[in-house]
């Protein structure tokens, strides 16, 4: 809310990417930016999509919520430039079907991903000495802290890629304060995740 007030004071247009808003864990709740900072109503573009929740990324469909009619018109005009494509019909129909009929899928998916997150947390605590996992409040992207083993980030990344055959995102990609972390995507079949964790253990616990 405080950041929203600052943006409002200085006339900043805020683009809020809330594509992961459906994934909060164990009773947590996502607060939409416009609820946290109502003062931004006229200067906010809120971006959501069914692509993460319903695995529809290939259909390239998203929703942009722009309460301010003038800002919305500017957005539409910019989108109509030759470099931008319109949503395809199949994507629009799939988006509507997902939001209107996808509650059962969504609840089952959340339960499954919570199980995956618990699996990673327990495995790291029990079988990867020196490595810790930051318990997530939201999303299925997990942060593993590899600073404990004392290896440079470049060496950890190299070992993961060439020995464990795993491609994680190194923390420094997201800024200097994240150096030493690796980001793991837990949104996959549990057997795939178990195999990845075991290869990680074999690589760092020789």
Predicted features along the sequence, with ranges:
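PLP-dependent class I/II
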Residues: 1-206
